[in-house]
């Protein structure tokens, strides 16, 4: 197989047409840009088939998209699937070298998750926060004991700063960032990411920030 890296995201569509990938890894914003680009061309050229337009934008071989670094909505995932592109979400961080979970493309019912935990990786939820223990977890931050103490508990669990939960099949779900929680006057914690994701599904909403 051949691995291609795009060092200039403004040229990603050019590189896709040049290298004709079968699998691509992008953040959700780029995936949304793909779908929007195809929708715009479809509207401008109603006489052209969706397959023809998709192949013009994304090449003839792309059939799988791996998303990370943010939430990939079910609506966006379905739009890509209608184009013949199966999606999957993964989760990781540099401190874990980097994988924590990987997508399972056979489980469409788990599309809202970020995949199942990788072998040897253990997760616990403390006050809503995802904490990880694995042989791949870092020993600490170089020459920064204070930051290391903040990131790794005394019993060796890495604090990710992300909120989420694990279901009974070891699929991991993300709810937002711990630092972003909004505490209401009644003491209830609200994750702005969950609100954003909910309204992002609405076709009348182009962009939203909470």
What are these regions (language model features)?
Residues 3-5, 74-127, 136-140, 149-157:
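Conserved ATP-binding loop and adjacent catalytic segment of the adenylate-forming AMP-binding
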Residues 2-21, 25, 190-195:
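ATP-dependent adenylate-forming carboxylate-activation enzymes
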Residues 9-10, 28-29, 70, 74, ...:
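Alpha-helix N-cap/helix-start capping motif
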Residues 3-5, 64-67, 183-184:
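Short catalytic-loop micro-motif centered on adjacent basic/acidic residues
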Residues 199-208:
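Short acidic amphipathic segments
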């Amino acid at each position: 197989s051949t691995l291609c890296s795009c060092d200039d995201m403004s040229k990603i569509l050019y590189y896709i047409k040049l290298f004709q990938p079968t699998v691509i890894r992008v953040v959700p914003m780029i995936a949304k840009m793909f779908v929007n680009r195809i929708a715009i061309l479809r509207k401008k050229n109603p006489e052209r088939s969706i397959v023809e337009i998709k192949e013009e934008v994304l090449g003839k071989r792309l059939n799988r998209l791996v998303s990370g670094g943010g939430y990939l909505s079910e609506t966006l995932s379905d739009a890509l699937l209608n184009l013949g592109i199966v999606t999957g979400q993964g989760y990781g961080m540099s401190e874990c070298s980097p994988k924590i979970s990987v997508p399972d493309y056979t489980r469409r019912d788990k599309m809202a998750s970020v995949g199942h935990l990788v072998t040897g990786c253990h997760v616990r939820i403390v006050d809503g926060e995802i904490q990880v223990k694995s042989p791949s977890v870092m020993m600490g931050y170089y020459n920064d004991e204070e930051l290391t103490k903040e990131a790794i508990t005394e019993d060796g669990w890495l604090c990710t700063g992300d909120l989420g939960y694990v279901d009974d099949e070891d699929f991991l779900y993300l709810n937002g960032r711990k630092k972003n929680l909004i505490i209401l006057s009644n003491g209830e914690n609200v994750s702005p990411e969950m609100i954003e994701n909910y309204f992002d599904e609405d076709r009348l909403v182009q962009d939203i920030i909470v």
